[in-house]
Amino acid sequence: MKKKQFLKESDVTAESVFFMKRRQVLKALGISAAALSLPHAAHADLLSWFKGNDRPPAPAGKPLEFSKPAAWQNNLPLTPVDKVSGYNNFYEFGLDKADPAANAGSLKTDPWTLKISGEVAKPLTLDHDDLTRRFPLEERIYRMRCVEAWSMVVPWIGFPLHKLLALAEPTSNAKYVAFETIYAPEQMPGQQDRFIGGGLKYPYVEGLRLDEAMHPLTLMTVGVYGKALPPQNGAPVRLIVPWKYGFKGIKSIVSIKLTRERPPTTWNLAAPDEYGFYANVNPHVDHPRWSQATERFIGSGGILDVQRQPTLLFNGYADQVASLYRGLDLRENF
């Protein structure tokens, strides 16, 4: 089935409009001082567009060897590498979208240890080299949808999580998978200072049901645009679950633990009425403070680059994953 494309050449904003003075742009968008008083996550991405014309460098990671299976290639317009590497949420390095690229160079990613434990027959420990050599790597072009109602299309490189979990041999007691980011406050300013880190409790933790973790789409990601992940994108290994909001994509993972009970997750702990455990992309279930019916695609230009496009149920992966939630109330279990 041919996939719907929502971006047209006419959607791209003229260069003369993009380079309007900041005050003119704010006025044109109807953004008032009151709007800017909203909680940071609701508007920090918007303000990041007005930081000037400087662009962070492209990822400087080493080139990776990987295949490009036809099943994971498509004709979706890719988000440019400078946006993928320079427009990020990684609160351990600051709240502004440009902060991770500016501050994440302090993160030491080699050596690295990733432990797989819990309800498994064969606990595992992987080192830095294992992450790129133990499993065949493949490039997958995935949509990425942030809960803040913006989106990207990214050529991630990695291996299916189910291959790693299969080596550990989950026991019959395993129902969930818990993930944990490195805790290194000496390297991560947001873990040192609650103001810098958005008031979250660290280390960052996430979780999936076991069947979600075993789904072929769920990717342990070690690279982007042909190279190893840069620190601001979650080096050396992060999770990508393309049918869920981006905050489920935990970065810089040091622990994977299979559990009997549903594990706590950082954003659900911080604001349970706003961020659910499932976090499936759903245009029919709004965030309490903004609509999820549409999204802004982050393309090659600035804030006025494209028109909004419709949000797709499960981020366009409904055919592959909807059966996981048969009989589940998606409004209640958001």
UniProtKB/Swiss-Prot annotation:
<feature type="binding site">
    <location>
        <begin position="249"/>
        <end position="251"/>
    </location>
    <ligand>
        <name>Mo-molybdopterin</name>
    </ligand>
</feature>
<comment type="subunit">
    <text>Heterodimer of a catalytic subunit (MsrP) and a heme-binding subunit (MsrQ).</text>
</comment>
<protein>
    <recommendedName>
        <fullName>Protein-methionine-sulfoxide reductase catalytic subunit MsrP</fullName>
        <ecNumber>1.8.5.-</ecNumber>
    </recommendedName>
</protein>
<dbReference type="GO" id="GO:0016672">
    <property type="term" value="F:oxidoreductase activity, acting on a sulfur group of donors, quinone or similar compound as acceptor"/>
</dbReference>
<feature type="binding site">
    <location>
        <position position="88"/>
    </location>
    <ligand>
        <name>Mo-molybdopterin</name>
    </ligand>
</feature>
<dbReference type="InterPro" id="IPR036374">
    <property type="entry name" value="OxRdtase_Mopterin-bd_sf"/>
</dbReference>
<dbReference type="GO" id="GO:0030091">
    <property type="term" value="P:protein repair"/>
</dbReference>
<dbReference type="GO" id="GO:0042597">
    <property type="term" value="C:periplasmic space"/>
</dbReference>
<keyword id="KW-0479">Metal-binding</keyword>
<keyword id="KW-0500">Molybdenum</keyword>
<dbReference type="InterPro" id="IPR022867">
    <property type="entry name" value="MsrP"/>
</dbReference>
<dbReference type="GO" id="GO:0043546">
    <property type="term" value="F:molybdopterin cofactor binding"/>
</dbReference>
<keyword id="KW-0574">Periplasm</keyword>
<feature type="binding site">
    <location>
        <begin position="91"/>
        <end position="92"/>
    </location>
    <ligand>
        <name>Mo-molybdopterin</name>
    </ligand>
</feature>
<dbReference type="InterPro" id="IPR006311">
    <property type="entry name" value="TAT_signal"/>
</dbReference>
<feature type="binding site">
    <location>
        <position position="233"/>
    </location>
    <ligand>
        <name>Mo-molybdopterin</name>
    </ligand>
</feature>
<keyword id="KW-0560">Oxidoreductase</keyword>
<feature type="binding site">
    <location>
        <position position="181"/>
    </location>
    <ligand>
        <name>Mo-molybdopterin</name>
    </ligand>
</feature>
<comment type="similarity">
    <text>Belongs to the MsrP family.</text>
</comment>
<feature type="signal peptide" description="Tat-type signal">
    <location>
        <begin position="1"/>
        <end position="44"/>
    </location>
</feature>
<comment type="function">
    <text>Part of the MsrPQ system that repairs oxidized periplasmic proteins containing methionine sulfoxide residues (Met-O), using respiratory chain electrons. Thus protects these proteins from oxidative-stress damage caused by reactive species of oxygen and chlorine generated by the host defense mechanisms. MsrPQ is essential for the maintenance of envelope integrity under bleach stress, rescuing a wide series of structurally unrelated periplasmic proteins from methionine oxidation, including the primary periplasmic chaperone SurA and the lipoprotein Pal.</text>
</comment>
<keyword id="KW-0732">Signal</keyword>
<dbReference type="Pfam" id="PF00174">
    <property type="entry name" value="Oxidored_molyb"/>
</dbReference>
<dbReference type="GO" id="GO:0046872">
    <property type="term" value="F:metal ion binding"/>
</dbReference>
<feature type="binding site">
    <location>
        <position position="238"/>
    </location>
    <ligand>
        <name>Mo-molybdopterin</name>
    </ligand>
</feature>
<feature type="binding site">
    <location>
        <position position="146"/>
    </location>
    <ligand>
        <name>Mo-molybdopterin</name>
    </ligand>
</feature>
<dbReference type="InterPro" id="IPR000572">
    <property type="entry name" value="OxRdtase_Mopterin-bd_dom"/>
</dbReference>
